[in-house]
Amino acid sequence: ANPDLEVMVAGGDGDGYSIGAGHFVHAARRNVDMSYVVMDNRIYGLTKGQASPTSREDFETSTTPDGTNQTPVNPLALALSSGATFIGQTFSSDAQSHAEVVRKAIEHDGFGFVNVYSPCVTFNDVDTYDYFRDSIVDIGETDHDPTDRDAAIERVTEGGTEYTGVIYQDPDSVPYEQREGIESNMAEIPDGAPEDAMDLVREFY
């Protein structure tokens, strides 16, 4: 509504990749100029530890005692296949790197998505801080080119590697608002309906 504001949305893996997945996909597809940061702890922490869309297939909880028996959602692959023009991943324990990736997402012209590994110390004893510290690979220390979409696809579909850093960024991204010529500040539109619209209301009521 106000093109002068930076729009940031924060959520979790439970809502973002489940009931809110449709909003995520279409915001990415349209390339809306906003940043979306998801705290991914691979569990529903606030509702006492049920499996989330990113929980491991064999992850046992009170509601899935035999595991989920479902392939977990791959957030980076979902974002990439939906058309996101900036995709990053960070670890909540590495504040400096996290802040840098989020800054780049905010500065990006278009939809900036950051998935954040945020271990739940209460209900998830598998995907722990120690697990991520041992498993994470900083993609910036590899030969990865974040502007190469095919390379990004290859990285996000690799099994067993937990990458952090900027996975993909389209240098030619044109945000939805610019592409569609949306320039007006809706906050400056006068209140109230036009008089001709009110005439229609009076005619039927």
Regions found by a protein language model. Name each.
Residues 45, 96-98, 114, 121-126, ...:
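Short acidic/glycine-rich loop or secondary-structure boundary segments that cap or lie
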Residues 4, 52-105:
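Conserved thiamine diphosphate
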Residues 9-11, 86-91, 113:
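Short catalytic-loop micro-motif centered on adjacent basic/acidic residues
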Residues 1-45, 100:
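Thiamine diphosphate
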Residues 50-57, 95, 102-111, 125-138, ...:
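Short, surface-exposed, charged loop/turn segments at secondary-structure junctions
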Residues 19-23, 29, 46-51, 124-129, ...:
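Short acidic, glycine/serine/threonine-rich loops at helix termini
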Residues 35-38, 88, 115:
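Short hydrophobic alpha-helical runs that function as membrane-insertion/retention elements
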Residues 120-205:
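Flexible, low-complexity linker and terminal segments
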